Regions:
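Extracytoplasmic cell-surface/polysaccharide-interacting catalytic and binding patches
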Residues: 15-243
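Bacterial N-terminal signal peptides
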Residues: 3-12
Length: 243
């Protein structure tokens, strides 16, 4: 079945990932937490130009090639769709994710005095810097950042087709409804499992529960000491089909 296919695709990248050219010349410890500038590593990453984006974005070349095929086939299968459906977000490095987090910490969640509760509020939809799947250049947000937009019209056509067909191109929705913990449902978020599956295992090996202090020493963001202990749970509580 398709679950088995995704597992086999992911396993292919897990073996000796630390020595793999998957990181290019970026140190594994840095790659896994997004501590790099994608524009300086065009052997791995490329700017997205073939599909509309809301601003200049970069993505892994292998993941983009797969998504381009998906995008093209989705358009052919659904001729009523507009031809300018956008990628809303793609690769976000550590600095970029830190900006998102700190703006929310100081902004819309500022009135929550308890730092743990403030962090949990942000974590409903935004990752701690150093834990986001967007760091890896394998995950993108597509069309809209509102779940309700996928209940009707264009969004419903997209989501219905994606849930049936995305796995054929290596993509999986990591944040589905009904999971026991972690981020809220994100119908817009899709991950290229042939690469991200191995990267999640690598993150656990390098920065998992037993080495969380190592992760904490490499990231710096508001509330890190209060919510950092939860990092592993948010990295790993995903759709079982994406494991």
């Amino acid at each position: 079945g398709w679950c088995a296919l995704l597992v086999l695709l992911a396993v292919a990248t897990q073996g000796s990932l630390a020595q793999s050219p998957i990181y290019g010349n970026i140190a594994e410890e840095d790659y896994l937490i997004g501590k790099f500038d994608a524009t300086m590593h065009d052997g791995i990453f490329t700017q997205i130009t073939s599909i509309p984006t809301n601003y200049p974005m970069w993505f892994r070349r292998d993941a983009l090639n797969a998504f381009e095929r998906l995008y093209k086939d989705m358009m052919v299968a659904n001729p009523s769709l507009p031809t300018n459906l956008p990628i809303v977000s793609a690769l976000r490095n550590l600095t970029y994710q830190g900006g998102i987090w700190d703006r929310k910490w100081q902004g819309e969640y500022h009135n929550i005095s308890n730092p743990v509760l403030r962090g949990l509020g942000i974590l409903e939809y935004s990752a701690m810097p150093g834990t986001s799947r967007h760091h890896w250049g394998t995950d993108l947000d597509f069309y809209s950042l509102e779940n309700s937009d996928f209940d009707h019209g264009i969004g419903k056509i997209i989501y219905t087709w994606m849930t049936v067909n995305a796995y054929k191109y290596g993509f999986c929705q990591p944040y589905t409804a009904g999971r026991c913990a972690g981020y809220n449902e994100e119908r817009w978020h899709w991950s290229y499992i042939p690469v991200s599956g191995g990267l999640r295992h690598a993150w656990n090996r390098v920065y998992g529960d037993t080495t969380i202090c190592k992760w904490a020493s490499k990231v710096d963001f508001s509330g890190a000491k209060s919510v950092g202990i939860m990092a592993s749970a948010y990295v790993n509580t995903i759709n079982p089909s994406c494991l």
